[in-house]
Amino acid sequence: MMEQIKQYEYVDLGLPSGLKWAKYNVGAEKETDYGYYFQWGSTKPNTADECIWENYKFYNSAKYSLTKYCTDSLYGLFGIVDSKTTLGTEDDAATQIMGSDWRMPTEAEFQELLDNTDNEWIEDFNGTGVNGRKFTSKTDTS
């Protein structure tokens, strides 16, 4: 079933949590658009080539360390970890671009999506030349 929050469409995949997923990636206007590229915690769209450590917002290149969203002291600046695995609204591309009703999914929500949907890799989707992963509900959500 397709619904909308603001101008963005979402789908109900019948997940146990009741979570709804956006029909398209952030920045996409239709299912054959790839949308924007983001590094974790960045709200500024990048090209795929720009998504490298040296450009990462929370990477201290002088110290080869993470300054935020770090769960391992080996990588934290001066060994400091913040154990953050969920984006703050100020660092959430979906929230910043699509509005406060939207956010990037957590790792657990991605796992729920994988565990409770059928998904397949599609090449040349409907003759458009676009490749991507298609997720389909395992339950009837109509």
Feature locations, PLM:
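Conserved positions within compact, well-structured domain cores
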Residues: 1-142
